[in-house]
Amino acid sequence: MKFAAIALSIVLIASIVAAQDPAVVNAKTIKVKFENDRVRVMEATLPPGVKEQVHSHPAYVIYVLEGGKYRNYASDGKVTEGEFKDGDVIYRNPITHAAENIGDKPIHLILVELKTEGSAAK
C-alpha cells in the first residue's frame, strides 16, 4: 500500500511538471526548434483571440518577429496588458503564466529558455 501511494505521488508530480511545459500544453501554438543542455529555442505563433494554457518558463529571452497586443495572466492572479513591437528583444525572469492575444493579428515570437545560470563565454 505504501509503495502504491509513493508511485502514485511520483506519477502525479511528473504530470504536473509536464503539464506546465509550454510546448506540451500549447502544442498547437508553440514548437520546439532546438534544445540542448543549456537552452531551448521555441517558435510561438498566437492567433488573435487565442489564450494559451497555463505554463512555466525558466529565465528566458523573447525575440519578436511579429508583434501585437497581449494580456498576461500571472500565477499570482495579476493580469497585465502590453504590446510587443516587431524586432523587440526582451529578457524575462522565470514565470508561470498564460498569455492571450487581444489584438487583431497573429503574434509571432522566438523564445529562448535559459537552462543554466552563469554560462558566460570565456
Which residue stretches match the model-derived regions?
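Bacterial N-terminal signal peptides
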Residues: 5-15
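Histidine-centered metal-chelating micro-motifs
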Residues: 49-52, 90-100
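Boundary at the C-terminal end of the N-terminal hydrophobic targeting segment
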Residues: 17-20
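Short acidic-glycine-tyrosine-enriched beta hairpin
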Residues: 35, 76-94
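Ligand-binding loop in jelly-roll beta-barrel domains
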Residues: 67, 94-117
